[in-house]
Amino acid sequence: MNLHEYQSKQLFADYGLPVSTGFACDTPEEVAAKAKEIGGDKWVVKAQVHAGGRGKAGGVKLVDTPEDAAAFAKKWLGKQLVTFQTDEHGQPVSKILVETCTDIAKELYLSAVLDRASRRVVFMASTEGGVDIETVAEETPEKILKAEIDPLVGAQPYQAREIAFKLGLEGKQVNQFAKIFVGLAKLFVDKDLALIEVNPLVITDTGDLHCLDAKINVDGSALYRHPDIKALDDPSQEDERERRAAEWDLNYVALEGNIGCMVNGAGLAMGTMDLVKLKGGAPANFLDVGGGATKERVTEAFKIILSDDQVKGVLVNIFGGIVRCDLIAEGIIGAVEEVGVTVPVVVRLEGNNAELGSQKLAESGMNIIAAQSFDDAAEQVVKAVGGAA
């Protein structure tokens, strides 16, 4: 689960990390009022969406008056912000963050991620702040410094000092960096995070370190332990179909093709998409209904898949282990009937009672094509939709 910048900065502040004074506002009038409350003669206003690249898209601006801040808010509130990280529709802007302007002498990069290879939290830092870290990793990987955190002892100040010296920090900056480093590590573990990113971590004109931006991703599997964090979720920033799927414990990811895929098992789902692509088709989604492929879940899965106007056909690929294929077939028939599916549906059943399941599909009298094999299923659905999207 992603957090907005203003939410991430509040968590930073709770852990004693240096962030700008700011307020998340809902109206242009509130933006102007909060700018006056903050004081000063310059402010930064930022559209709040779960996407990077806001600055280049016009979603971040330096303003000189509260009236200019209000005008920025009026321009963006209720609108869609399109960046290189969003789709063509962008993401809705419902809040504007107005905060103090910080004078920047130098930009650095600092982040922490859960590295599955080492099974530890790994910090990454670089002198190349304010830019896309993926670009830095690809073009100049030697500029990225790393430190693994031992889960038994936690982040140690000596690790922070070692990175600080390599970043060229000196004097009070070394201790400030150590405080930020240890604070972020504690926040990461305390809140079960998957990612923290400070880009940029800046050196101000007075020589102090300051977290100018903040990005946090929370491990969704741990949200039950953090109701306070779960309450920060903003459903408007999520794909509507993915949100509905999550409510039914369905794993759904929208793609750009025209063949809807419904499969039980993540590995089989990925293999299904690969084979569809190999046969000249284009998957419209990844959808894993899991082991409990009940009629209700299958029905909801059909609704989610068919809510995509690009879908011209559906491939259902089920391997029956504990779950009987004949019961799954009944669920598919009931779902197709209830949803009123009008596009071709190709079903491949394999495993427990597969023959009986295929027989029920054939006798249903509905527009359901029972495939003879995995390969046949992919060929049939690609043929049914007329080839690639």
Swiss-Prot record:
Family note: Belongs to the succinate/malate CoA ligase beta subunit family.
Domain ATP-grasp intervals: 9-244
Pathway(s) the chain acts in: Carbohydrate metabolism; tricarboxylic acid cycle; succinate from succinyl-CoA (ligase route): step 1/1
Name listed for the protein in its UniProt record: Succinate--CoA ligase [ADP-forming] subunit beta
Pfam family, one: Ligase_CoA
Positions bound to ATP: 46, 53-55, 99, 102, 107
Cofactor(s) for this UniProt protein: Mg(2+)
Residue numbers binding substrate: 264, 321-323
An example Gene Ontology CC term for this record: cytosol
EC number: 6.2.1.5
Job description of the protein: Succinyl-CoA synthetase functions in the citric acid cycle (TCA), coupling the hydrolysis of succinyl-CoA to the synthesis of either ATP or GTP and thus represents the only step of substrate-level phosphorylation in the TCA. The beta subunit provides nucleotide specificity of the enzyme and binds the substrate succinate, while the binding sites for coenzyme A and phosphate are found in the alpha subunit.
